[in-house]
């Protein structure tokens, strides 16, 4: 909110308090996540239903993760010992060193941090998901035009995947017979005028960074962290990614 950056795009969960209390606006969701738990294989635990009183849990202090963890254990009537740190690397190091029985954060984070463990194969992520964690870009309140530009930049990437427009074929799609595709690549209509942009602003996004699927593959799937997109698949393919049409 200090004005040092124009956009924040990281693992920040969209919540009511963050949206309403601190002068920020979430423009959309670019990753649907959920909180889970990691344990050591030799613990014999394969489900959160096996958690017992006295369990210790590592997490980040001052986060929705910490609040979700508290709510989860309280709702199950399980007494637990929180082991909280400010930095993610500190949490991972503490868990890896055996200072806690389980490590909890968003499941994407668990998958990524598991690769940093001394022996990654000694750890498993439990199947249960205990929260909804919609993650997405954030801008400061008070600049409606910039907010719209960021929102529709995200929408462009998702819609481009839906219509098969990629960084490789975007220019060729200008001659498509589909009016929606033509609008998406700036060959028809005046989609940029409302933002003070030219008509190929969304075409440049697609050519430079690709559609949503290309971005997911490059940054997540190809790393081996989460090859299965799960809810982050298009709505036409069993996921929940769905954006308003560009028209």
Region locations from a protein language model:
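Sec-exported extracytoplasmic/periplasmic mature domains
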Residues: 1, 5, 42, 56, ...
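Extracytoplasmic
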Residues: 2, 21, 32-34, 52, ...
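Short, well-ordered beta-strand segments
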Residues: 8, 38, 56-60, 103, ...
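Bilobed "Venus flytrap"/periplasmic-binding protein-like clamshell domains
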Residues: 13-14, 33-93, 108
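Extended ligand-binding regions for polar small-molecule ligands
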Residues: 40-45, 49, 63, 109-110, ...
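Extracellular/periplasmic bilobed ligand-binding domains
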Residues: 86-122, 137
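Conserved C-terminal helix/tail region of periplasmic/extracytoplasmic solute-binding proteins
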Residues: 217-247
């Amino acid at each position: 909110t200090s004005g040092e950056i124009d956009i924040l795009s990281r693992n920040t969960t969209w919540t009511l308090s963050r949206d309403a209390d601190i002068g920020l606006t979430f423009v959309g969701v670019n990753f649907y996540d959920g909180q889970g738990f990691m344990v050591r294989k030799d613990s014999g635990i394969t489900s959160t239903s096996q958690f017992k009183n006295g369990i210790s849990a590592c997490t980040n202090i001052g986060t929705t993760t910490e609040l979700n963890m508290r709510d989860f254990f309280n709702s199950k009537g399980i007494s637990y010992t929180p082991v909280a740190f400010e930095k993610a690397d500190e949490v991972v190091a503490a868990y890896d060193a055996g200072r806690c029985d389980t490590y909890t954060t968003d499941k994407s984070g668990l998958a990524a941090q598991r690769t940093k463990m001394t022996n990654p194969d000694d750890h498993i992520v439990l199947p249960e998901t205990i929260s909804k964690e919609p993650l997405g870009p954030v801008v400061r309140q008070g600049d409606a035009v910039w907010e719209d530009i960021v929102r529709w930049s995200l929408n462009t990437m998702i819609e481009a995947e839906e219509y098969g427009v990629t960084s490789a074929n975007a220019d060729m799609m200008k001659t498509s017979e589909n009016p929606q595709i033509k609008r998406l690549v700036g060959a028809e209509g005046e989609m940029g005028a409302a933002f003070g942009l030219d008509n190929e602003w969304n075409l440049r996004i697609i050519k430079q960074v690709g559609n949503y699927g290309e971005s997911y593959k490059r940054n997540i799937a190809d790393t081996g962290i989460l090859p299965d997109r799960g809810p982050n698949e298009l709505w036409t393919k069993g996921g929940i990614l769905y954006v308003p049409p560009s028209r």
